[in-house]
């Protein structure tokens, strides 16, 4: 089978990038998802991978609506979860445009997917899909690897890893030929997996791992003593599976970018300062006359807001900032990964940007903080003079008697 791409297919005008609807992410991706490219989006269950794919479909349909003559179609490949078509019904009042331009197909085997793309490439002159989304691609790959491992009587990690790389190279080669012949964009939606999952002994997994009691079977702890000090990292299920190894770069070259979706917390500082007056009674004193009045200059109140983040992994070490037509190379991983904050807007049903509101902390550093590491109040407040005047705007003062021996 020929793996080459005719040069005439490359010397054409590039179509307009497909917007994700998240401004910060589009800026990193050079105005959006590029044509003739394959992207991987992975994340834990419930993070919104399918909703992200639906939003790409909606943005593509809106572009079709604006174009009077457009023969481009959208293909959604279902694996083990049906496409949420009801979201498109709510989004588009004229559902006819969805029925005419969005095609769905269900594939549950890795071999079926490979055969499907081989035939799709042969029919690329008659049927052209502008956008192809595969929801659950990693699950097809993992099931395929498990079947091969059981059929082979329990392959060693090196053998199954090399087999995984060869099969991914094969299917990504067919996908790449299709994207370059039609100018389409392929998005694969994958799960993520804990990197501690490395054993291929399916019958004895309980001896190595225990399920955390958090209501899900997602995070696990290692029971094996030699794995106790390992750091568990969430990675794409194409990488972290029973076929982990060091040669994943051989098939990652087919991906333009890898985007990880995770949850995070946005810290917001409330600048309201709470002032309290406290009287500390010495252990030798029997009355309140021996109490010393001190002022505590509170601790800033912090609120944590739940949100989502998208981490863009630049797999090929290319700097996003172009100098002319040349791409700059970067060896530092910190320079290659970009983080974008976003969340799901319930009002519009779309993913949106989050703008950080950073408070002015210029005066916060001048306030002394309260230390709780020592039981001696004289050591805690040794920098505060008891004869100072009360602070302005000291509303809601509170007097508390502390026994230094307590």
Curated annotation (Swiss-Prot):
One of its GO terms (biological process) is reciprocal meiotic recombination. Keywords: ATP-binding, DNA damage, DNA repair, Nucleotide-binding, Nucleus. Residues 385-406 are annotated as: Disordered. The keyword Secreted does not apply. It is found in: Nucleus. The keyword DNA repair applies. Disulfide bonds: none annotated. One of its GO terms (cellular component) is Rad51B-Rad51C-Rad51D-XRCC2 complex. InterPro entries: HR_Repair_Mediator (IPR052093), KaiC-like_dom (IPR014774), P-loop_NTPase (IPR027417), RecA_ATP-bd (IPR020588). One of its GO terms (molecular function) is DNA binding. ATP binds at residues 43-50. Transmembrane segments: none annotated. PROSITE patterns: RECA_2 (PS50162). Required for radiation resistance and meiotic viability and presumably acts in recombination and recombinational DNA repair pathways. Belongs to the RecA family. RAD55 subfamily. Present with 1050 molecules/cell in log phase SD medium. This is DNA repair protein RAD55. It comes from Saccharomyces cerevisiae (strain ATCC 204508 / S288c).
């Amino acid at each position: 089978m020929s793996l080459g791409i005719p040069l005439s297919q490359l010397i054409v005008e590039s179509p307009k990038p497909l917007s994700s609807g998240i401004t910060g992410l589009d800026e990193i991706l050079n105005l959006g998802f590029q044509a003739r490219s394959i992207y991987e989006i992975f994340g834990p269950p419930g993070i919104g991978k399918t909703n992200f794919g639906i939003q790409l479909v909606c943005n593509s349909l809106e572009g079709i609506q604006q174009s009077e003559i457009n023969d481009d179609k959208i293909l959604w490949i279902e694996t083990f979860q049906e496409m949420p078509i009801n979201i498109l019904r709510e989004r588009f009042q004229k559902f006819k445009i969805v029925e005419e331009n969005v095609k769905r197909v269900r594939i549950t085997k890795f071999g079926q997917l490979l055969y499907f793309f081989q035939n799709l490439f042969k029919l690329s002159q008659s049927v052209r899909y502008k956008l192809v989304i595969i929801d659950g691609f990693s699950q097809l790959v993992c099931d395929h690897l498990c079947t091969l491992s059981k059929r082979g009587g329990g392959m060693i990690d090196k053998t199954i890893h090399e087999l995984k790389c060869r099969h991914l190279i094969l299917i990504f080669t067919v996908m790449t030929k299709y994207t370059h012949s039609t100018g389409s964009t392929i998005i694969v939606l994958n799960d993520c997996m804990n990197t501690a999952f490395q054993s291929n002994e399916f019958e004895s997994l309980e001896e190595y791992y225990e399920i955390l009691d958090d209501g899900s079977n997602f995070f696990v702890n290692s029971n094996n003593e030699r794995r106790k000090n390992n750091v568990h990292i969430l990675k794409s299920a194409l990488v972290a599976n029973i076929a982990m190894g060091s040669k994943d770069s051989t098939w990652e070259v087919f991906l333009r970018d890898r985007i990880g979706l995770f949850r995070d917390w946005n810290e917001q500082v409330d600048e309201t300062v709470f002032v309290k007056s406290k009287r500390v009674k010495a252990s030798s004193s029997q009355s309140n006359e021996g109490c010393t009045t001190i002022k505590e200059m509170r601790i800033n109140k912090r609120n944590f807001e739940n949100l989502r983040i998208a981490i863009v992994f630049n797999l090929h070490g290319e700097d996003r900032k172009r100098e002319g037509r040349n791409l700059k190379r970067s060896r530092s991983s910190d320079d290659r990964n970009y983080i974008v904050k976003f969340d799901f807007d319930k009002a519009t049903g779309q993913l949106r940007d989050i703008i950080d509101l950073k408070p002015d902390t210029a005066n916060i550093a001048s306030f002394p903080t309260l230390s709780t590491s020592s039981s001696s109040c004289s050591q805690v407040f040794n920098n505060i003079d008891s004869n100072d005047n009360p602070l302005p705007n000291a509303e809601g003062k509170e007097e508390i008697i502390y026994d230094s021996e307590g």
